[in-house]
Amino acid sequence: MDVEDSDKNSLINPLRIFKREILPLLADLRLAIALLLIIAICSISGTVIEQGESIAFYQENYPEKPALFGFLTWKVILLLELDHVYRTWWFLSILILFGASLTACTFTRQLPALKSANRWKFYNKKQQFKNLALSAEIETASLDSLEEILQKRGYKTSKEGDKLYGRKGIIGKVGPIIVHASMLIILAGSIIGSMTGFLGQEIVPSGETFQVKNIIDAGIFAKSQIPKNWSVRVNRFWIDYTPSGGIDQFYSDLSILDKSGEEVDRKTIFVNQPMRYHGVTMYQADWAIAAVKVRVNKSPVFRLPMAQLNTEGGGKIWGTWVPIKPDLSEGVSLLAKDLQGNVLVYDTSGKLVASVREGMFIEVSGVTLFIDKIIGSTGLQIKADPGIPIVYLGFGLLMLSVLMSYVSHSQIWAFQESERLYIGGKTNRANVTFEREILDILDRLGSDENISLEKQKQLFSDFSEGIKTSEN
């Protein structure tokens, strides 16, 4: 028997500790606010600090001397995992703890409040009406007339003998619960996205086909999201320029190819207009010059890759070297800064000869050089986040629940004692509107019961004094 009691106590004690110690702590509003502030700070850091970049990038942009803000260096960023904030164990733990706090608050406060508001309550003492902010006494009025008036105004009523209770706007009590539920859905979507999503980048020349391989950030369960059964072909990449020579828009004509190489989808994307296929979204993010096609004298047209040069902040420039002798002992240099078709030609001594356009010939260092075409590369950001639809659902419910929360929960009580009717009410918001409604109900009740004009004036005067007293 003692052993059985000991086993029961070992099971009961942790449950008792949870209910008495842990649950009240989780449901504490101060904890929820603190966690919300921490999440906001972490989100800001993840927005300010570039996510998913290489170590070299952070070493260059966040050096040890001088440290940003006096403490933020590349070592601190890597130590605290600020280079991928939204996928760190500590950030996900904070989200889970915040979700637990919302859940505890819902079950310990919001649901009991809804249950209490949904109960039929009756007042049968004059003192109960005096304790209400709005109350009045009427002679020669009946509960039946009051019940009919309340029902016409959308109140749900219940009568028990000489007592009446009416209420409306119970949905306003449901609103806060749905607010919590929608926030939990948003948190769930964020966690799912962090654990199963990925982010990739590809620089692909026009005319080439690629599969997503350059993954720069991914969740621990993201493997199934990375496309393996289809590839992408860049049919064409081009840039529209303004009359002044500035870039107006980037365009990429993309095709989705199945395993057999057949086209199953096609779309031209540009900035803020991505392509979506099987949960993967491809954004137009960057561009580069991949290569230039040239011909030397009577040789066939051949393709030379172009590399981006370091201009120390002087803008983007790509260059290549064209051999003009079979032993590769001499060559001329070509430079290009955009896809408008202009190429700068330098001779073997490094002297600028001329600026030529695509489709033109030029004599340089004893050879005839033909510039056939500049080939651009599109920079694509490739992303999958299965949690986004869940987050959108949560935000949709959140907006709906906020509107629901603004619905006033109004309650009216009445008690008949001989020829005297006691009426009182309260609401959780829009007090002025509720006061006007009560006055109108009293007006209708007085008219229906043929109460004299002088008596109505006295009634409304007393009621107004009660309102002023409650406001003071």
Curated annotation (Swiss-Prot):
InterPro entries: Cyt_c_bgen_Ccs1/CcsB/ResB, ResB-like_domain
UniProt keywords, alphabetically: Cytochrome c-type biogenesis, Membrane, Thylakoid, Transmembrane, Transmembrane helix
Location, primary (coarse class): membrane
Biological process per Gene Ontology, one example term: cytochrome complex assembly
Pfam families according to UniProt: ResB
Keyword Transit peptide set for record: no
Entry keyword Transferase: no
Positions of transmembrane segments: 29-49, 88-108, 174-194
Role of this protein: Required during biogenesis of c-type cytochromes (cytochrome c6 and cytochrome f) at the step of heme attachment.
Annotated PANTHER family: CYTOCHROME C BIOGENESIS PROTEIN CCS1, CHLOROPLASTIC
Similarity section: Belongs to the Ccs1/CcsB family.
Name under which the protein is recorded: Cytochrome c biogenesis protein CcsB
Phylogenetic placement of the source organism: Bacteria, Bacillati, Cyanobacteriota, Cyanophyceae, Oscillatoriophycideae
